[in-house]
Amino acid sequence: MNLDLHRNIRIQKLAIGVERAPLLVIDDVVANADELVEDAASTVFAEPAGFYPGIRAWAPPAYQQLILAKLRDALLECLGVPNGITSGITSGLLRFSMCHYSLVTTPPEKLAAPQRIPHVDSLAKNALASIHYLFKASLGGTAFYRHRKTGFETIDESRNEPYFRSLRDENLGPATLGPGYINGDTDLFEQIAKQDGAFNRMLVYRRNSLHSGCIGSDFVPDPNPRTGRLSINGFIDLV
């Protein structure tokens, strides 16, 4: 697959909430996004381990190489590395530790409790998550949250125990959580930022930011990559 950045690529550098965690919003990412959709349509998907509410398949190496090479400076800035200078800090190399085509296929009423609240992907501050939307219908984007009781917008190792202790104390249950995907303010969480899903838009944020997909109660799962809620989800590490 021959991929390149779109000539009209646009990068917005935003900050989330009171804690000002970084967020990149990148529109018109690749020049040939439709080829990614067709590639996904010819790929075998499977249910992964963990709590992802759908099915996944490996994204092509050419995609990973393009993103790491052409967006390196923006990614390093999102990691808090000034001007791309990594000498004395790390090797300066970026790598995808995970990069998958992803399709949300779990109906709202079938979600487990952890899938109905915002989550973090890791406790590491210096690790990124990316989501590249590859659907053209109005199927929702991604939102970021503050836990009301603790005030936490990000969860690191020092916050992990008090955060989950607080959740246990709040006695999470069906009535507390609501019947489906979180999609706005609740008694437990305040939505502090939201980005709509748009074809060929990518979000990049730190993996310890509390976040969730914006998926409505009327969401109808579709396992077809050409018509379903297809994205490329990745974890990017500085090594």
PLM region spans:
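Fe(II)/2-oxoglutarate oxygenase catalytic core
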Residues: 1-204, 208-239
